[in-house]
From Swiss-Prot:
Subcellular location: Membrane; Nucleus envelope; Golgi apparatus; Cytoplasm
Name by which UniProt lists this protein: Transmembrane protein 209
Residues of this chain annotated as glycosylated in UniProt: 57, 274
UniProt-annotated stretches for the region Disordered: 120-156, 200-232, 250-270
Membrane association type: Multi-pass membrane protein
Bilayer-crossing regions: 28-48, 60-80
Keyword Magnesium: no
Record keywords, A-Z: Cytoplasm, Glycoprotein, Golgi apparatus, Membrane, Nucleus, Phosphoprotein, Transmembrane, Transmembrane helix
Encoding gene, per UniProt annotation: Tmem209
Primary site of residence: membrane
Biased composition (Low complexity): 138-152, 260-270
InterPro entries for this protein: Cytochrome_B561-rel (IPR019176)
């Protein structure tokens, strides 16, 4: 096997592009050089005349050093630009092309050297011993207008499975190759094929090498000696045709690469000849990429999407009764996130901190049995009455804990919900695990806990009312829980109604209208958001005598401007 390691010369197109870039750069660097010389001259004139220092009455020596640095910089830039201009003018990149290539590439006569036209006639050259200078040269290097010195070389790695014996190269003509190219049989190929010339035709139609399954020659013409110009239609006369041809060839090479199981095989390598294959040639490849049905999407996913769409449409219908601005509904997710964050930062986190502070004070006072989360609500209420002067915040904390007899679970769940900043552990229809056992209906849901602490917080912000001596002003007026029912016929009723406990579901009653938002994980938050939105838009931000805006509770900021 021949060893060939000859690196190809830069392509003609690359050198053409380089030459064009040099031509364009030569104009630009000349302009920049003149500009830099002008700037340096102006600064030098100012240095000798001291115009700026005299006009502005400033110290001359610091200014002189600054001007010297700028003049030096512009001078160096000018020298560099003139050096580049001189380089591109005196020693430009030159090309040796034929007149046809010059017209095709759009080159000027002054920058190229053209080869003289030749009178060509198709001749057949007798075989000669292999020339060492072209060992490893493939038939792909043939071109009617390419000299042997500029023909690309192909290493033997590109011809795996073949042993080409090139029979000679004519020294008398340009690009004239010997037709005596034979191939020796290798595994998988049981037929010797050789090129033969047809002296009567400039385009021989003899079968090329290796006419076997999986390898069909696109260009069946063997390399011949041309001594007459080819037809006009065989030349590309403009850049557009050249670009179209190159693009089509690149696409074909890309398709062959994708369809070839082994790029190193001579019958499947993306080279010059393996195009125009038949369907049978791709049989092995098509077996690897058999048509397969895609997996069906699961029905629950489709049902879930459909349910979400129906839920969204139902929510839009309910909100349309409150506001005509449908664009506000696009901000519902943002409002919900802000509201959850407000509950966490304003209620839950301070509540947990105060509970831990009170528990610490209880231990210091010698009352470890009154630890919050361990003692009953009744015991804590009695302690709040007895020790009110010592622990004034205990009575307010007890109001938040008056939800379930299981104080340990309630305190631990409030701590879990306060973590993460946005109640990430919130479960709308259940709660958390408690002491290794799953949540059950004997424990309050997270929705019930959040609703309770929200109502209790607003109880603490509203002024006392003589009608509600227990201090639950907001809860008594604006929250109704089943089995109790609100008086829908009363126009003054404005409340949140919990119509179901497990799973929890909330409705809004306002001016004899029932606003029933869709069931699900956001039902409680969206109901509370509608409650607050009505207060902002229809009640001027006032809940009774308390402002829920910036000067009061400061909760309406979640809706933006």
């Amino acid at each position: 096997m021949m060893q060939g390691d000859v690196s190809p010369n830069p392509s003609l197109i690359d050198r053409t592009i380089k030459m064009r870039k040099e031509t364009e750069t030569r104009k630009v660097v000349l302009a920049w050089g003149l500009l830099n010389v002008s700037m340096a001259g102006m600064i030098y004139t100012e240095m000798t005349g001291k115009l700026i220092s005299t006009y502005y009455n400033v110290t001359y020596w610091p200014l002189w050093y600054i001007e010297l640095a700028l003049a030096s910089l512009f001078s160096l830039n000018a020298l560099f630009d003139f050096w580049r201009y001189f380089k591109y003018t005196v020693a430009p990149t030159s090309l040796v092309v034929s007149p046809g290539q010059q017209a095709l590439l759009g080159l000027k006569q002054a920058v190229v050297q053209t080869t003289p036209p030749r009178d060509l006639a198709a001749t057949q050259i007798s075989p000669s011993p292999p020339s060492p200078s072209i060992q490893g040269q493939s038939v792909l290097s043939y071109s009617p207008s390419r000299s042997p010195s500029t023909s690309p070389k192909f290493a033997t790695s590109c011809m795996t499975g073949y042993s080409p014996q090139l029979q000679g190269l004519s020294s008398g003509g340009l690009g004239s190759y010997s037709p005596g190219v034979t191939y020796s049989p290798v595994s998988g190929y049981n037929k010797l094929a050789s090129f033969s010339l047809s002296p009567s035709s400039p385009y021989p139609t003899t079968v090329g090498p290796v006419e076997s399954s999986g390898l069909r020659a696109r260009y069946r013409s063997p390399p011949t000696v041309y001594n007459s110009p080819t037809d006009k239609e065989d030349y590309m006369t403009d850049l557009r045709t050249l670009d179209t041809f190159l693009r089509s060839e690149e696409e074909k090479q890309h398709r062959v690469k994708l369809g070839s199981p082994d790029s190193t095989s001579p019958s499947t390598s993306p080279t010059f000849w393996n195009y125009s294959r038949s369907v049978g040639d791709y049989a092995q490849t098509l077996k690897k990429f058999q048509y397969q049905l895609a997996c069906r999407s699961q029905a629950p996913c489709a049902n879930k999407d459909e349910a979400d769409l129906i839920s969204k449409q139902a929510a839009e219908e309910v909100w349309a009764r409150v506001t005509m601005n449908r664009q506000l509904l696009d901000h519902m997710d943002s409002w919900t996130a802000k509201f959850r964050n407000w509950i966490s930062e304003t209620i839950l986190v301070p509540l947990v901190q105060e509970i831990e502070s009170v528990s610490t004070q209880m231990r210091r006072m010698g009352c470890p049995e009154l630890q919050i989360g361990e003692a009953s609500v009744t015991s804590l209420k009695q302690a709040a009455l007895v020790r009110a002067p010592l622990i004034p915040t205990l009575n307010a904390i007890v109001q938040y804990l008056d939800l379930t007899p299981n104080q340990e679970y309630l305190f631990e769940r409030i701590k879990e919900l306060s973590q993460g900043g946005c109640m990430s552990s919130f479960r709308w229809n259940r709660g958390g695990d408690f002491k290794g056992r799953k949540w059950d209906t004997d424990l309050p849901t997270d929705s019930a806990i959040i609703m309770h602490v929200f109502c209790t917080y607003l109880d603490s912000r509203l002024p006392p009312h003589p009608k509600y001596p227990d201090g639950k002003t907001f809860t008594s007026q604006h929250f109704v829980q089943t089995p109790n029912k609100p008086d829908v016929t009363n126009e003054n009723v404005f409340c949140i109604y919990q119509s179901a406990v497990n799973p929890p579901h909330y409705e809004l009653i306002y001016q004899r209208h029932v606003y029933n938002l869709p069931k699900g994980r956001n039902n409680m938050f969206h109901t509370l958001l509608m409650f607050l939105y009505i207060i902002k838009t229809k009640e001027s931000g006032m809940l009774g005598r308390v402002n829920l805006g910036l000067s009061g509770v400061n909760i309406l900021w979640i809706f933006g401007e």
